[in-house]
Amino acid sequence: MTNTNIKKTKFLSFDGSVEIVSQHQRPDKFRDLEQIPKNVTRIGRGGGYSYTAPSFGKNILTQEMTSFNRILEFDEESRTVVVESGITLKELLKWSFEKKLFLKIQPGHPGITIGGCVASNVHGKNPHKDGTFVNVVLEIKLFHPDHGIKILSRTQNSDIFELTCGGFGLTGIILSVKLQLNVLPSDRMVFEKTSVQSLMDAVELFQNNLDADFISSWHDGSPSKKNFGKGVGYKGVFANSFKSSKLIMPKKEGITPFSRARLPFSVLNKTTAAVIYSFYRYCQITGPKTYERNIFDSLFPFGGNAKYYHLLYGKNGLSEYQILVDFKKVEEFIGDLIKLVKIEKPPLIIIFMKPFSGNQKYLRYSSSGVSMALNFQRSPITKKTLSKLDDILISYGAIINIIKGSSKQVVQTCFPEYYKFIEDLKKFDPRRIYKSDLSEKLGL
């Protein structure tokens, strides 16, 4: 390739687990995408905040789409907007806030791009109420060198639309997306904190507040009987009015995979985490039960001070294991999880939970139940524990969030449409031009 925009770059997954040097292009016009020879294996990339490596791989050209960040069309009556795939959630909110509109499904980091949201089919603050990102996607403009530009929607090329939403970028480069926006009720959210003594306490809290705008909990992962599962639940609703016409945003930019890894060692381990989170929980439950937070900090907790959480894992990073368990099976599953933690005593730092509702399709992290994100310090004991947790996960028919990491065997077993996804993808792209480290590891 003679394109001067292509260079060698070292890529790093956000959790620190995958590091690869490969070819890198930052196209700023469509012609840059078109001129790449058709035989070149490639993959699109957004902000680069995935815990795995769906946007880079060995001997694979990464096409970073962050220069494609314009707002192309807006229909005030229908509240729909067409944006280029490289626009970030932060940039979109900055624009939509002025119109008192917002995208109701948003993951926790403001630097994630819309293209990345589509490819990973992300979820937001209450997936039980709002579903996953596919629910706000109306239309996609996709480029594939063998097919040219294709318009995808639920009524046009619907099969490729379904493959692309939660398809990890394997159908081609997402050029633009038409999104459904919602009315923004306020510039603030009002939160209520609830002390929870166990994981099941949080499940009960969820079931009593499924219509909240925001619902989640965090729990101490310490293997000690005294602390495990204790935490705080949060219910949030929009305030009734606007206090300010200006969007309050942090002045400093968020962390990147490389800035996240600047500490040479992990501050968080079994001992320090138990002390830190016991103190933090004490402060949370003894302070005011209700509080207000501006809309930016409400939508993007990892865009504010909480971003430093990831820094505490140091250069070696963290291992996140995110699973979705059916409501009817969650109590028994939690019992087996507690037994495993007591036996193996892994450096399980914290557990985040929220309720889900939806239909599972292809490889999407979507179903009805409770989502649990288990954050471990990376270590040999963690690896051993996760191997045993895989067996428990499979026995309960739960699913795993692929974008947070998993093995081929687990993905094959957890997702009934694993082979259908591969078959349908090959029908559309027989030469399999779009690949990544993630797709290679999972046999996609």
Name what the model sees in each region.
Residues M1-L444:
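Noncatalytic alpha-helical scaffold of FAD-dependent oxidoreductases
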